[in-house]
Amino acid sequence: MQKNTGPALPGDRPIRRAFLKASGLALTGSQVSGLSLLSGIAQSKHVRASEAGAGRPSGRAKSVILFNLLGGPSQLDMFDMKPSAPVEVRGEFSSIQTSLPGLRICEHMPKIARLMHKATLIRTVTHGYNSHNPLNIMTGWSLGNPAALRPDPNDPPDIGAVCQYFGMGPDDMPGAVCLPCYPGWGESSMYPGIRRPGPYGGSLGSQYDPLFALCDPTFDRKPDRPYYGTAIALGEPKLPGAETVPGLTVDRLKLQRSLLLQMDSEFRRVATSKSLTRLDKLKDMAFLLLSAGKIRSAFDLSREPEELRLKYGGSLFGNCMLVARRLVEAGVPFISVHAENFLPNGSFTYDMHENNFAMLKDHNLPVLDTVLPALVEDLEQRGLLDSTLIYVMGEMGRSPKINAKAGRDHWPQCGFCLMIGGGIAPGAVYGETDATAAYPKSDPVSPADIVATIYKQLGIDAHTMIPDRAGRPMPIAHGGQPIPGIT
């Protein structure tokens, strides 16, 4: 394997930066927040796959969709109900029988109940990373700084970055896409500058970041106050493009790209090809984003029948799932959809320290019970479910004991993961918890095991080593093992 390359030669970036500024293509940080990376240039993909030591991986799953239930969904109120537990533990909800004999889940997820014979439910996800960052569920690494509100370049790369490192996916599409925005964007009014660690290239470099979509949600009503009457986010994820950069057009960008390519030929006389791969990737991203019809088409929901759009529910997250399906059709290997906190306007997170039951009943569970079955049915009807692995989980579970504000608090000791498609065994329940769903009773599963299982389905050996920033070998699944019996 090759070391991660160092910075470009000292003299080249200032020259190119000056050119970009003069030509009007010097974008500010706010203008490129959704343009973080599009690493799907054909030649570089083939080079990366070659440098990684083999051809592109090929497994049962060709694409993975993560639905990150940001905040920490309650295992006790969703998929691991304990009707015999004391009232201060079991909560207000009743259970219903699912399509999988012997399995009962929350009464407020009737559509999901009807598809459980197609899924594997893992009830014993456990770790010690008490944080709302999706770092652990996207990388398998649970030793990060739980207080971090921005990614660290030394963080391990997520699944999408590893897919890109191995050159997966078509040459004219990004290797990973993050919807509806980077995690933390909706919280920026409370925590300026927040970008929750997780969906990044990390130690592989920012060139392996996903393409971050943009969003500007509206809400179905004005919320009263947080945790009491929060509104549902509406709208669609948007592809960054010319509209995000004032005065930038495709024709103008093509001219600038032509000039930059001429400059690149001069740089090649004094720099190695590895250095050039790190030279202002923005120019390639912007060109591809603005001119490639395939990726723009994937974000164009007007191409979908109204009847199908209604099945997804019309919320921002329903539309994210529909875009995710379109990205799967286009061959994108890794798509992550993140519940987001848009306070004070609205929220779709599971961090319910207050009013847990009303929020779940009236807000979160109806949305989840709409968008997930719609996605599964849509993929299945198109013959894509067997090659698309969906995993649904949050970064932790919730505390068994209900607090004085009718909420549940953080509880990383026990949570769940739901897996569907992509060669995962249908109709399975893995692991058993104790009487209050506080701790695993058998078969504990770490986030690293979840990630290792996903790599296996993608055709990537979970024990593969890739270089960190210092060129030292680093395991992609951080010691995780594929979960036995579900693949």
Can you say where each PLM-predicted feature lies in the sequence?
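Ligand-binding pockets and gating/stacking loops
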Residues: 2-487
